[in-house]
Amino acid sequence: MFNMNINSPVRFVKETNRAKSPTRQSPYAAGYDLYSAYDYTIPPGERQLIKTDISMSMPKFCYGRIAPRSGLSLKGIDIGGGVIDEDYRGNIGVILINNGKCTFNVNTGDRIAQLIYQRIYYPELEEVQSLDSTNRGDQGFGSTGLR
C-alpha cells in the first residue's frame, strides 16, 4: 500500500519575515492554522487572495486541503478553492470570500484558514460504455431527502 512514515516532518519555508509558522491550537486539532502575511480589506460579496508567504513540500501521497475556520464562517467568511498538490512549491495563498453584509478586514498575523493533510490515491482511469447499476442510479441533489 502506501509507504508513508507519519512521523516524518513536513518541510516549509518562510518566504519573507512577514510569514508566520503554521500552528495547531490543540494537540488533536485536525488542521494547522495559516496566517495572513499582509493586511487586506474584503468588501461584502467580494473575494481576495490572501498570501501567507509560506511554501512547503507535501508528504508523499498527500495533498493539503485548505479548510475554513469555524469562527470566520460565523462571520460569513468562506474559502474558495483549497487544494495544495503534492508537487506545488509556491507561496500558499488562500481565497477568502466575504458572504457577509459588512466589509471584512484581514490584518497581518490573523489566522485565516486551516491546512489539513489528507492522503490521496492516484487511480488509473478507464473509459467504458456503461456503468454498473445501483439502487440510487442517477438521482442526485436532494434525492435522499432530509430525514
From Swiss-Prot:
Induction: Expressed in the early phase of the viral replicative cycle. This enzyme is involved in nucleotide metabolism: it produces dUMP, the immediate precursor of thymidine nucleotides and it decreases the intracellular concentration of dUTP so that uracil cannot be incorporated into DNA. It comes from the Viruses. Pfam families: dUTPase (PF00692). One of its GO terms (biological process) is dUTP catabolic process. Mg(2+) binds at R24. NCBIfam families: dut, PRK00601.1. DUTP binds at P68, R69, S70, G82, V83, I84, D85, Y88, G93, I95, R111. It is an enzyme of class 3 (hydrolase). It comes from Vaccinia virus (strain Western Reserve). Its EC number is 3.6.1.23. It catalyses: dUTP + H2O = dUMP + diphosphate + H(+). Belongs to the dUTPase family. Gene3D superfamilies: 2.70.40.10. This is Deoxyuridine 5'-triphosphate nucleotidohydrolase. The keyword Cytoplasm does not apply. GO terms for molecular function: dUTP diphosphatase activity; magnesium ion binding. InterPro entries: dUTPase (IPR008181), dUTPase-like (IPR029054), dUTPase-like_sf (IPR036157), dUTPase_trimeric (IPR033704). The gene is OPG046.
